[in-house]
Amino acid sequence: MTRPLLSPEWVARLKQFKKLIVGFSGGLDSTVLLHVLASTPPLYNQLLAVHINHGISGNSLNWQRHCEQLCLDLGIAFIAKAIEFDRSANVEEAARNARYDFFSSLLEDNDCLVLGHHLDDQAETVLLQLFRGAGVDGLAAMQECSNLGAGQLARPFLTCPRVELEHYARIHELKWIEDESNQDTKYSRNYLRHRVMPLLLEKWPGVAGNISRAATHCQQAKANLEVLAIKDCPDLLNATDHLLIEPLKGLEFERITNVLKFWLKKNRVQLPSSKTFQRIIHEIIFAKLDAMPTVSWNQIQVRRFQQHLYLLKADQINLPKAIKWQQFPASLTYPDANIELSAVKAQKGLMIPKDAQIEIRFRKGGEEIYWHDQTKHLKKLFQEWQIPPWLRERVPLVYINDQLACVVGYAVSDLFFTTNPLEAWSIVNNS
């Protein structure tokens, strides 16, 4: 008697979610996953199948129709999404990132994305990471459960060999898509699957399970390193885009690197090379107190100001010259630069004259604001407020009829200040 693909423990775990979003490519893995979930009564009403159309193959539309028909047959809600991504470099990675970005956008609180990755996929992932010279994080490969967006990601088949999925599909007479690109060995994973793994399995039949078990050991090591990082630098618990430097100076370099990795992962930043970590330690952490060095990689910057490290992403570097706030008081968003401002009623604050022209600008130099009965240079105020120099350019400035009326989060010009709660607004920077 074969074991069920979905254990009672997994059923209980998945049952707690409000919605189960199934990544449904139409291939063997996701077809079996969807059928298993649809055949589990406690989970059926939570299911939503999502098919990502990458538009790479000429068969893409036929595959989408196949997936839609199967969902219709099973009575499961279905969404198809065509995605755009950069095809000039690593197509596999770009497609994967675009796919996960869309999945993440669908997830709300207490939702779960369920994917059909199995034990053979895990073994391949470990080997690919090994060949790239990955550390513990990379060799930990895929986790059964992890956070994604506002929800969770689950891989209930991660301990199941592909042959068990094939057996299930045959018994239930399931039809699935065979993507012709899966045979193309120019892709690293396909080369590993078709050329390398057969040789390893010939010599060691249980090698996929052994490799997968190594990933589990690395996941435990990764968790232990995260505990150590927090012990070494308690500021990590509350750190966002800045991190206190002083606790790091008494640590060995390897432990400083461990803290930095935890901090960058917390900010969803791709980790740099070992050489870059060495540069951050030598050139920034142990720099002179008055120095303001920068280390960059992949449109990411780490900088220093006084006693903190600061992390800047690409969307924090490239800012527009001005944004008209035409729908005030509705929130203002500018995704390309990660800008989101909202206006809330206040007891005292910014007064917006009737028919005023409201515009958001950013510091270029020479700005002045009439504040506390004086005309003050913005540069001087930023120094008094101890705002890091590179962050000063990101502070939104509210201009009303071409006059600087508000430095968001810091000051409102006397010319536009009111204590009348019927007229007062507070501008909140949600970026």
UniProtKB/Swiss-Prot annotation:
GO CC annotations, alphabetized: cytoplasm
UniProt keyword ATP-binding, yes or no: yes
Catalytic activity: cytidine(34) in tRNA(Ile2) + L-lysine + ATP = lysidine(34) in tRNA(Ile2) + AMP + diphosphate + H(+)
InterPro entries (UniProt xref): Lysidine-tRNA-synth_C, Rossmann-like_a/b/a_fold, TilS/TtcA_N, tRNA_Ile_lys_synt, tRNA_Ile_lys_synt_N, tRNA_Ile_lys_synt_subst-bd
One MF term in the entry's GO annotations: tRNA(Ile)-lysidine synthase activity
EC number of this enzyme: 6.3.4.19
Residue positions binding ATP: 25-30
GO biological process: tRNA modification
Subcellular location: Cytoplasm
Superkingdom of origin: Bacteria
Family annotation (Pfam families): ATP_bind_3, TilS, TilS_C
EC top class, as a word: ligase
Keywords from the UniProt entry: ATP-binding, Cytoplasm, Ligase, Nucleotide-binding, tRNA processing
Function: Ligates lysine onto the cytidine present at position 34 of the AUA codon-specific tRNA(Ile) that contains the anticodon CAU, in an ATP-dependent manner. Cytidine is converted to lysidine, thus changing the amino acid specificity of the tRNA from methionine to isoleucine.
PANTHER family, sorted: TRNA(ILE)-LYSIDINE SYNTHASE-RELATED (PTHR43033:SF1)
Entry similarity comment: Belongs to the tRNA(Ile)-lysidine synthase family.
Swiss-Prot/TrEMBL domain comment: The N-terminal region contains the highly conserved SGGXDS motif, predicted to be a P-loop motif involved in ATP binding.
Protein name in the entry: tRNA(Ile)-lysidine synthase
Organism: Legionella pneumophila (strain Lens)
Upper taxonomic lineage: Bacteria, Pseudomonadati, Pseudomonadota, Gammaproteobacteria, Legionellales
